[in-house]
Amino acid sequence: MNQDMLNVFLKRRSIRSYTGEPIPMEKLNMIIMAGLSSASGSAIRPWELIVVRDPQKLIDMSGCRLRGSSRMLAGADAAIIVVANENLSDVWVEDSSIVMANMHLMASALGIGSCWIQGRLREAIDGETTEDYMRRLLQFPSECRLEAILSLGMPDEDLPATPPESLPFGKVHINKY
């Protein structure tokens, strides 16, 4: 593996605090392209991306989780919501997760702060499911299921890269568990 690529993986952190400075559109487009280029089972690509930059909509979205860090959306410059048509693929969760991971890593490589906000199987502050809460705000069709939300902004914190020696190599098993 290329050392530069490994450094991107080690540098990727969940960033929840943003400066308020806008993300340049060319960088946001690169993050989107990273998602669109994701691997997909049988190349079905059951997912759709909803990009939100409207400040009021981001504030409204910040209530999408009862617990967790969705409140950061109120201070984000953008969010990318990944939904997928579950009727198109039985691996829509996996395919959508690959999209999220690619975008999360690209954001890090570009110096953009990002954080994965789990949407599937979660509850919003008003008692709805996170999926129904987001569907009401973003009007995605009923056959589309919510996987996750990627919060994006210029980072207001600089977290250190993960030291390679702290990686859990004990979780690696060769030839048997």
Regions found by a protein language model. Name each.
Residues 1-177:
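Acidic, surface-exposed loops and disordered segments
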